[in-house]
Amino acid sequence: YGDKSDWMYMLVRTDPSASKQKGISLLVVDMASPGIEARPIDLISGKSSFCQVFFDNVKVPKDHLIGPLHGGWTLAKALLQHERRAMSKFGEFSLPNHFDLLELAERYLPPAASSSLAEAGLRARAIATAMDEHAYKLTTQRMGEEMRARQNVSGVMSIMKLVHSEQEKDKFEVLLDLMGHRALGWEGDAFEAEELAVARAWLGSFAQTIAGGSSEVQLNVIAKRVLELPEGKQAK
C-alpha cells in the first residue's frame, strides 16, 4: 500500500565500513517528499497491495531517525515480529474465516452413499484440514494469552507464521478440489460471489508464504532461535 501510505520506514546503510547487520539505521520517510514515486504491482489475485517505491535524490531530515544511529537492525526484527503476529492472526482484529471447508464439502459433493472412492478421500482431506485449522486457532488463543502475560514468544512467532501460511495454501488446494470448476471463475454472473472470492483468495494464498518473511526464512529462524541448531554446519 505504498501508493496510499503517508509515511514509510526504511533501513539505510549509515556505516559502509560495518559488516552485515551492523551499520544499518531505521528512518521514517514522508511519502510526499519530492522525488518519491510509488508504482503498484499487479498481482495474480487481481489486487495491487504491493508497490515498487522509487527514490530520486530524496532527502530525509536527520530527526526522522528512529532509535540509535546504526541500531536499525534490532528495530527491524521487532517490526517483523509484529508483522508475523498479524499474519498469524494473533491480533484481536484478525479476519474471520469466510470459507468453511465442511460446509462447502456438503454443498459441492454428492451424498456419501453415492460418492466415489476419490470423493471419499477428498472428504477425509477436508475433515483433516478442518481439524488442523481448528487446532491452529486454539493454539493462537493460547499464544495470545502467553503474549499478554509478557512471556517471550518471539521464536514461536515464526513457527505460527510458517504453519498458518502453509495451512492456508493447503486449505485452498482442498477447496479447489471440493468445488471443481466452480472455484475457477474470475468474473461474471455465471459464478456466485463466494466462488469468485475463493478463486482470488487461492491465488492470494501464495503470497502469504512470502510476506513477512518467506517460509524458507522462517525455517532458518526456527532452526537458529528455537531449536538452537549450529549455523553453517552439516550433520554427519
Locate the predicted segments by residue.
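Alpha-helical scaffold segments that form or flank carboxylate-/histidine-based iron centers
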Residues: A120-A128, V153-V163, A199-G204
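A short core secondary-structure module
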Residues: Y1-R39
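C-terminal helix-coil-helix/basic helical segment that borders enzyme active sites and/or dimer interfaces
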Residues: P110-A113, L117, H134-A190
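Glycine-rich phosphate/cofactor-binding loops in nucleotide/flavin-utilizing enzymes
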Residues: L75-G91, M179-K236
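Glycine-rich beta->alpha junctions and the first turn(s) of the following alpha-helix
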Residues: G35-Y136, Q208
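Tryptophan-centric aromatic hotspots in well-structured domains and transmembrane helices
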Residues: W7-Y9, L26, F50-F54, W73-L75, ...
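Short, well-ordered loop/turn and helix-capping segments at boundaries between secondary-structure elements
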Residues: R13-S17, D30, P34, D56, ...
